[in-house]
């Protein structure tokens, strides 16, 4: 690179980047009864003429399922907003369908095993990928598509969409879509998982206008911290205890626990009468045919 940086500036940049990554992962990995604090306003100054209600930042959170009852966002305050822009966090409670999704920010050596399990069990999934993943893991992307899975958009650089201009949001999404298409041949990309779980009315509108459905989740746990893995049994119990009809399951592919527990999770869900479906089924459900 031709531009040279002062060491102090470089250290500051690295620290800021790491803080941003940590914050993003924290917000993507809920571990409490409510996954994150209720909706909060972004750090824009309301006195700034550029600020508007459409820039208010929401951090996705939900009340976890208990005893098979559907997870809820009623207490979060953003339910009507998601409905207005066609976003989803779970499917219909009618029928016993589950939708398996993975967030792939970077590769930690477990995605191949996850794909092996999905292939063995005949389960479809959607993998939400970032620009880093696209650039570093082209062969895994090809395998995902070849084996019938969907690749969704998790943005190019994992930013807070509520702080980006409309143009920057479009650039973030278009670049992922374009490069995934170049690598895999998947021309259509319809599903978006907002990076860090942060969104605004404006980001919902901009992404909807680009043809995306924002896909949140109704099952998750703190699985993203690779330094605090607690074993396959822990992963299994956290997911199975939250199962409910129509659930969208969020797992992070960096988790060793998830990779080791996935087969048992699928088997137990099926034992309870659940069927794993593609997100395409959620958005365009086929009529149930008589046996």
Where are the regions a protein language model picked out?
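N-terminal pre-catalytic segment of deacetylase/amide-hydrolase enzymes
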Residues: 2-100, 107-114, 120, 274-291
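Active-site beta->alpha N-cap acidic-glycine motif
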Residues: 61-162, 168, 172-181, 188-189, ...
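Structural recognition of the beta-strand scaffold that forms the well-ordered cores
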Residues: 98-101, 125-129, 150-153, 190-194, ...
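Active-site beta-loop-alpha junctions enriched in small/polar residues
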Residues: 105, 130-132, 156, 195-197, ...
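Alpha-helical scaffold elements lining the catalytic groove of polysaccharide deacetylases
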Residues: 110, 159-184, 198-245, 258-260
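A short acidic, amphipathic alpha-helical/loop segment
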Residues: 113-116, 139-140, 203-206, 261-265
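Catalytic grooves of carbohydrate-active enzymes
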Residues: 243-280
